[in-house]
Every structure is written in structure tokens, then in C-alpha cells.
């Protein structure tokens, strides 16, 4: 009988990536198949996020429901991972003693051994250590699930923003070696992946080791990834302004595979509040980055994160944020009311902004962002957009669906052979959450690079000199 695994994931794209790796790992080692139903699982894993308010209570609420399943099936294994697990550690078992495994983001690769231990002597396991980049050496080969894929290139963060728990839950920055990343991307490309999203808490801080022992830069990595046959669209998430260097901007100038869309969080438009947040950059420095980006790539769209109601934020500070939003003309962005995370410096600050004022500021900010998003979308009406076709539309089985470079969902009439490929679509209608269009060009008509195998390159470049010796001309 097939053993079943259920994974519940909360939080960022890094958590989504980690959960997919857990599923692949436990399938390879124990034969577990994923199930959407917790009731039929042999192992339940909760991959948690500690960014939002009341994250811990959300975890224990779900665990309370899983406790009932364990009463019915005493052999059921329950594991809690992610950032809340890293933060709380043994306290999770103190409050929920029926939890068998507590593991952190850096120890998920040890799950097979943890499960074996619990199965063997029924003793619980708690491991929330930080064994650097070891987890990537222990994970199975990637498995593609559609034409887009996430690839983690680094873990942790050294920036220690005063409101953020990431350095405490995921550790400090550790970069994967360049060859490891390129090999994973090449494996995904061989399985039909056309778009990769490079992940890291501070992705542009990547400083991985090259094959010769030298240290590479993020700009160099972007060019290498974009050069892999089959990969025709490259994204990255999330970056920090302090390390958004000119060499990265140059990649936008000369690498068309890099999308014309960037998520670059600024958090606030007031230098005074940015200083309280520990952001180490000014508004002027942020605006200078955007100006250079738009010189290199005039059509680029920018998204951001915003925190409103940070301790000490005045009406003037908030108005400066609103001014910056208008000046940059941000596209889709993410905004939140400040909530103190335990153990961070901001948790010790006086939270002096009234709750109603926070809600009002959030409403005003989101309304402005939504207006700008609508305006950006309307500008696309009548234009031709390159779409990566993901599959059948949710709205109609008679239509296909894909995404633009700026993440707009576009539905259109097409043929099944277009799935997993690029098509150029004329935008005919802009709706609230999607767009509608018609095909004007298929991938065969685009002149994209033709993938070549090493054997075909050797055959094409093979020559014989006057003495009959075989030489190869690159």
C-alpha cells in the first residue's frame, strides 16, 4: 500500500521551494506520495512562517486539529518545520507533546533519518541547528513541475533589519557554489523548464565559489544561468537595495532573458524610519538605483514591500512614503501593518502608532498602489506580450493560460502543443485579475535559441587538419 505524505506550507517562495524538496526527498528515500488530504496521510509536515502576526498561534491551531487525527491513528507522524520551528524549538513539543519532529529550514535534509528514528524507538526529534549549506548536498535531483521552477541559490541574511526574524530563523548568508546552481538549472531545463526564479532572502548578496576557487558575483551568475540552453526567462527574488550594484544593472542592459520586472523592497519613504528599521540605505540611493535601471531597461516595472505604522512613524513619514510611491510608480506591491516579532530589536521599541491610524494608512497606501497597478495593466491593452504558457485556463478548458514578464495572467485560445512554450499574445481585454488576448506568433516563429547537445556541437565543429588529426573549432 502506498504511503502518503501531506505538507502544509505557509509563507514565502523559499518555503514553497523547501516543501517541494521535502516531498522529493521523502519520495526518493521512503516512497511517500503527496496527498492533499491530511486525513489519509502517514506523515504530516507543517512548513511554517514567522513573518506575520500571531504566527505561533496559527501553528498551534492547526496542530490542535492534527492531534485529533493522531488519536485515531497513533502511528501518524507529525512534524513542524520552517521559521516558527526554528524560533520556538523544543517549546513546540512542550505545548504540543504529540508532535514527533521539530526541524529548521537548514535541517530539512535530515528528515529521512528523523522519521526512521521516530518509527524505530518512538523517541521525538528536535533539530533546529544551522549546518550551513549541507542541506543542498543531501537533496535529490530536482523534478520539474511545469515550465517554471524555483532554484534556491543561497540561504539566510546578514542585514539584521530591526523588524525581521530571518537572520535568527534561517541563519546568516551562505551561498551555494556556482556549479551546483548551474547543474540544477541545467537538469530542470532538460526536463522542459523554460523559466527559473533564483531564490534567496537577499539574493543579490550571492557570492558563491566558482569551479576554480574564485568567488563569483550575482551579476556573473545571472549571465551564466541565462546562457543555459532552454532557459529563456530568468527572475530573482528577493533583493536588497544596499547590494544592488551597477554590474547587476548592466545585466539588464545586455541580457534579454532577464525579465523587465523587479521586486526591490524599499519598506518606507522616510530616511528617519529607514534608519530605525536598520535598512542602511536612503530614499535617494533607492531612487538612484531605479533611475539607472530605467536607463538600462526603459520598460522595467518595479514592485516593493511596505511596512506602515512602524514604531515612531509620524504623519510626515507616511506622507514621504506616499510621495515615493507616486514618484517610482510601483506596480503590484505587498504592504503590511507593523507587528513586532519576538526577539527582534523592533519588538523593544515603543509601538506608539494607534491601531486605527495604522489601518487607515494601510488602506490609503493600498488604494494608491491598486490605482497604479490598474494603470500599468491598462497600458498593456493593444500591445503584444510574450507569454509562457502554463496550461489550461481556470476559466475555461477551451482556453490556455500563461504569464507575462510582469506576472499578469493572460487567457487565450490556443492548441495543447503550446503548453510549456512561449507565444506572443495581443492583449484584447484587461480584466480585474487577468487579461484576454489572441495569438499573434508562436515559438517556432520567434527565432529563440535552438538547444544543442554536446554531441551536436562536437559533430558540427569537427575538422581534420592537413596531417589527418581531428581538431574542434569552437
From Swiss-Prot:
One of its GO terms (cellular component) is cytosol. It comes from the Bacteria. It catalyses: N(6)-dimethylallyladenosine(37) in tRNA + (sulfur carrier)-SH + AH2 + 2 S-adenosyl-L-methionine = 2-methylsulfanyl-N(6)-dimethylallyladenosine(37) in tRNA + (sulfur carrier)-H + 5'-deoxyadenosine + L-methionine + A + S-adenosyl-L-homocysteine + 2 H(+). It is an enzyme of class 2 (transferase). [4Fe-4S] cluster 1 binds at residues 12, 49, 83. Residues 143-378 form the Radical SAM core domain. Its EC number is 2.8.4.3. It is found in: Cytoplasm. Residues 378-441 form the TRAM domain. NCBIfam families: miaB-methiolase, MiaB/RimO family radical SAM methylthiotransferase. HAMAP family: tRNA_metthiotr_MiaB. This is tRNA-2-methylthio-N(6)-dimethylallyladenosine synthase. It comes from Enterobacter sp. (strain 638). The gene is miaB.
Amino acid at each position: 500500500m502506498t504511503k502518503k505524505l501531506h505538507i502544509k506550507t505557509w509563507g514565502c517562495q523559499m518555503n514553497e521551494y523547501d516543501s517541494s524538496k521535502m516531498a522529493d526527498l521523502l519520495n526518493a528515500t521512503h516512497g511517500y506520495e503527496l496527498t492533499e488530504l491530511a486525513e489519509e496521510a502517514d506523515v504530516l509536515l507543517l512548513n511554517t512562517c514567522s513573518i506575520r502576526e500571531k504566527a505561533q498561534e496559527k501553528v498551534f491551531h492547526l496542530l490542535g486539529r492534527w492531534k485529533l487525527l493522531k488519536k485515531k491513528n497513533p502511528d501518524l507522524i507529525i512534524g513542524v518545520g520552517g521559521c516558527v520551528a526554528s524560533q520556538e524549538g523544543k517549546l513546540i513539543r512542550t505545548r504540543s507533546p504529540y508532535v514527533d519532529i521539530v526541524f529548521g529550514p537548514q535541517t530539512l535534509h535530515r528528515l529521512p533519518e528523523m522519521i526512521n528514528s521516530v518509527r524505530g524507538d518512538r523517541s521525538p526529534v528536535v533539530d533546529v541547528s544551522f549546518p550551513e549549506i549541507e542541506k543542498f548536498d543531501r537533496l535529490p535531483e530536482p523534478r520539474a513541475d511545469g515550465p517554471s521552477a524555483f532554484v534556491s541559490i543561497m540561504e539566510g541574511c546578514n542585514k539584521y533589519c530591526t523588524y525581521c526574524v530571518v537572520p535568527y530563523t534561517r541563519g546568516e548568508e551562505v551561498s551555494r557554489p556556482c556549479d551546483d546552481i548551474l547543474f540544477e538549472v541545467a537538469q530542470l531545463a532538460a526536463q522542459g523548464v523554460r523559466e527559473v526564479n533564483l531564490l534567496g532572502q537577499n539574493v543579490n548578496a550571492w557570492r558563491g565559489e566558482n569551479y576554480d576557487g574564485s568567488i563569483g558575483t550575482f551579476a556573473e551568475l545571472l549571465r551564466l544561468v541565462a546562457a543555459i540552453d532552454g532557459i529563456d526567462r530568468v527572475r530573482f527574488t528577493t533583493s536588497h537595495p544596499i547590494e544592488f550594484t551597477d554590474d547587476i544593472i548592466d545585466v539588464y542592459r545586455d541580457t534579454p532573458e532577464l525579465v523587465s520586472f523587479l521586486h526591490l523592497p524599499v519598506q518606507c519613504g522616510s530616511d528617519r524610519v529607514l534608519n530605525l528599521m536598520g535598512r542602511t540605505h536612503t530614499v535617494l540611493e533607492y531612487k538612484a538605483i531605479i533611475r539607472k535601471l530605467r536607463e538600462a531597461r526603459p520598460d522595467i516595472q518595479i514592485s516593493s514591500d511596505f511596512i506602515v505604522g512602524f514604531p515612531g512613524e509620524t504623519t510626515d513619514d507616511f506622507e514621504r512614503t506616499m510621495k515615493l510611491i507616486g514618484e517610482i510608480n510601483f506596480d503590484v506591491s505587498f504592504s503590511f501593518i507593523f507587528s513586532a516579532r519576538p526577539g527582534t530589536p523592533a519588538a523593544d521599541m515603543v509601538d506608539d502608532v494607534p491601531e486605527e491610524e495604522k489601518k487607515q494608512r494601510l488602506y490609503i497606501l493600498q488604494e494608491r498602489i491598486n490605482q497604479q497597478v490598474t494603470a500599468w495593466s491598462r497600458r498593456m491593452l493593444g500591445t503584444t506580450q510574450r507569454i509562457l504558457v502554463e496550461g489550461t485556463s481556470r476559466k475555461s478548458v477551451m482556453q490556455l493560460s500563461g504569464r507575462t514578464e510582469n506576472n499578469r495572467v493572460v487567457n487565450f485560445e490556443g492548441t495543447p502543443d503550446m503548453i510549456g512554450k512561449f507565444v506572443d499574445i495581443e492583449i484584447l481585454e484587461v480584466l480585474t485579475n487577468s487579461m484576454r488576448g489572441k495569438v499573434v506568433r508562436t515559438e517556432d516563429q520567434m527565432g529563440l535559441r535552438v538547444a544543442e547537445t554536446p554531441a551536436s556541437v562536437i559533430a558540427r565543429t569537427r575538422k581534420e587538419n592537413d596531417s589527418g588529426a581531428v581538431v574542434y573549432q569552437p
